[in-house]
């Protein structure tokens, strides 16, 4: 009875995680009886994982490790983990490789043997393969299936060496015109330097492709337009200009040719070029120099004179010998010394002038102070004279009053004696 319950849990867990067509979601009695009759022993990790899945729900990662005895071979271990009639059907249903490699195999070798998933299984992640350890133990990981995003693409398998050679073969083979007109070349022909190498580096392929495409473009233009040595097409434009130096002799020859052709107004660049017949001169040089010659000829006399003076001064400076240059330098140094001394004398004179003005202000102030002092001395004497004169006038008035009083007394005495006084 306990074995039947374990088998039922094993079938349910296996169908929930991997959707195997070998297991029926509804535990039928005949399947349980057939499994029990076959005497299949189930992986204990699956039973414990199923219990953990029922305990925590569908939101956890299931992880169980089972270490088999060292005596049991890997084939027996793999047979115990299978559900079905044989191991081949289980591997085909779960898209797992046949674990027939040595015990010390790597994950890369197992992944290389694994078949590529179809579009029907894109909703689930592939189950990690069972890796055999050195001690003949099996480690099994059960991962919860997750739905992929709609925009996520299925990873492509790594390209093999044959595919890489075919791609390089299609990239460099055939003539350029055949590749341009008819698409993919039919005949594979490599240059000698390319044929020497079995596999070309991937980094060199774009540059070689660009070179071949450029050569194809040049060939498609046609043989009627030859390519010039400068790299430009003959009909696309003028070649690059070269600069020359117009020496005095060359300029004199140019002026003679211009005069022979009737002057700067009537002379043409082609006629001047034919008359000069000088190597290295082109029509562009003649045109440029003729334009400058015309501008210099019709310029005003003043500007022309200034240019002549500048040229003469420059020529004189160039023709000076070192001794004359030293003399001129010494004269300039003496002139600077004289100017410096003159400037110092002017500063001294300015300081003296300021001192003289300040001394004049002081003298003016002293004169004003002396005048004020003299006025203050003369004013008290005048006041004394005025006071003395005023005192003399007061004494005369007093004597007159006394006389008047005496006469009044005398008059009153005569009145008392019986005489009428006529004094008023």
Swiss-Prot record:
Induction of the gene: Highly expressed in the adaxial and abaxial cells of lamina joint under Pi-sufficient conditions. Strongly induced by nitrate via PHR2-mediated transcription activation.
Coiled-coil segments on the chain, per record: 326-391
Role according to the record: Transcription factor binding to specific DNA sequences of target genes promoters, such as the motif R1BS 5'-NAKATNCN-3' and the motif P1BS 5'-GNATATNC-3' to trigger their expression. Nitrate-induced component involved in modulating phosphate (Pi) response and homeostasis together with PHR2; activates directly the expression of Pi starvation-induced (PSI) genes upon nitrate disponibility, thus triggering the nitrate-induced phosphate response (NIPR) promoting Pi uptake activity.
Quaternary assembly: Interacts with SPX1 and SPX2 in the nucleus; these interactions prevent binding to the promoters of target genes, thus regulating negatively leaf inclination in response to phosphate (Pi) starvation.
Location relative to the cell: Nucleus
DNA-binding residues: 269-294
Tissue-wise expression: Mostly expressed in roots and leaves blades and, to a lower extent, in leaves sheaths, culms and panicles. Localized in leaves lamina joints.
Protein name per Swiss-Prot or TrEMBL: Myb family transcription factor RLI1
Main location: nucleus
SUPFAM superfamilies xref list: Homeodomain-like
UniProt-listed GO biological process terms: brassinosteroid biosynthetic process; brassinosteroid mediated signaling pathway; cellular response to phosphate starvation; negative regulation of unidimensional cell growth; positive regulation of DNA-templated transcription; regulation of leaf development; regulation of phosphate transport; response to nitrate
InterPro entries: Homeodomain-like_sf, Myb_CC_LHEQLE, Myb_dom, Myb_dom_plants, PHR1-like, SANT/Myb
Domain named HTH myb-type: residues: 238-298
Keywords assigned by UniProt, alphabetized: Activator, Brassinosteroid biosynthesis, Brassinosteroid signaling pathway, Coiled coil, DNA-binding, Lipid biosynthesis, Lipid metabolism, Nucleus, Steroid biosynthesis, Transcription, Transcription regulation
Motif (LHEQLE): 342-347
Superkingdom of this protein's organism: Eukaryota
GO cellular component, one term: nucleus
Source species of the chain: Oryza sativa subsp. japonica (Rice)
Disruption phenotype: Compact plants with reduced leaf inclination associated with shorter lamina joint length due to smaller adaxial and abaxial sclerenchyma cells. Repressed nitrate induction of phosphate (Pi) starvation-induced (PSI) genes leading to an impaired Pi uptake activity. Lower accumulation of ILI4/BU1 and BC1 in lamina joint cells. Reduced levels of brassinolide (BL) content. Strongly reduced biomass associated with leaf senescence symptoms and lower Pi concentration under Pi starvation in plants lacking both RLI1 and PHR2.
GO MF term (any one): DNA-binding transcription factor activity
Family: Belongs to the MYB-CC family.
Residue span of region Disordered: 144-165
Pfam families the record matches: Myb_CC_LHEQLE, Myb_DNA-binding
């Amino acid at each position: 009875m306990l074995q039947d319950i374990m088998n039922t849990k094993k079938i349910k867990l296996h169908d929930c995680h991997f959707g195997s067509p070998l297991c029926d979601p509804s535990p039928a009695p005949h399947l349980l009886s057939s499994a029990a009759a076959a005497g299949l022993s189930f992986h204990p990790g699956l039973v414990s994982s199923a219990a953990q899945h029922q305990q925590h729900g569908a939101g956890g990662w299931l992880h169980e490790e089972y270490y088999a005895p060292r005596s049991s071979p890997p084939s027996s271990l793999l047979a115990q983990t299978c559900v079905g009639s044989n191991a081949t059907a289980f591997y085909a249903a779960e898209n797992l490789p046949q674990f027939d490699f040595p015990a010390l195999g790597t994950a890369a070798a197992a992944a290389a043997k694994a078949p590529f998933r179809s579009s029907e299984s894109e909703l689930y992640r592939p189950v990690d393969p069972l890796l055999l350890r050195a001690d003949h133990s099996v480690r099994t990981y059960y991962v919860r299936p997750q739905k992929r995003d709609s925009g996520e693409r299925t990873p492509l398998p790594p390209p093999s060496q044959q595919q890489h050679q075919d791609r390089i073969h299609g990239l460099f083979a055939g003539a350029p015109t055949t590749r341009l007109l008819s698409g993919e070349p039919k005949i594979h022909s490599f240059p000698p330097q390319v044929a020497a190498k079995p596999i070309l580096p991937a980094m060199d392929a774009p540059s070689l492709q660009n070179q071949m495409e450029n050569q194809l473009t040049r060939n498609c233009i046609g043989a009627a337009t030859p390519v010039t040595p400068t790299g430009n097409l003959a009909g696309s434009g003028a070649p690059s200009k070269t600069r020359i130096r117009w020496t005095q002799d060359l300029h004199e020859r140019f002026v003679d040719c211009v005069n022979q052709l009737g002057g700067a107004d009537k002379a043409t660049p082609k006629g001047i070029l034919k008359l000069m017949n000088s190597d290295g001169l082109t029509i562009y040089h003649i045109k440029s120099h003729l334009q400058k010659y015309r501008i210099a000829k019709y310029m005003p006399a003043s500007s022309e004179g200034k240019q002549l003076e500048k040229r003469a001064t420059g020529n004189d400076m160039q023709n000076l010998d070192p001794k004359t240059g030293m003399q001129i330098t010494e004269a300039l140094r003496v002139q600077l010394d004289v100017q410096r001394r003159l400037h110092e004398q002017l500063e001294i004179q300015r300081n003296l002038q300021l001192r003289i003005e300040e001394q004049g202000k002081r003298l003016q102030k002293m004169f004003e102070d002396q005048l004020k002092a003299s006025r203050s001395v003369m004013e008290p004497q005048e006041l004394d004279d005025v006071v003395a004169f005023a005192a003399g006038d007061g004494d005369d008035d007093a004597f007159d009053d006394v006389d008047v009083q005496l006469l009044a007394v005398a008059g009153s005495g005569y009145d008392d004696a019986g005489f009428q006084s006529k004094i008023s």
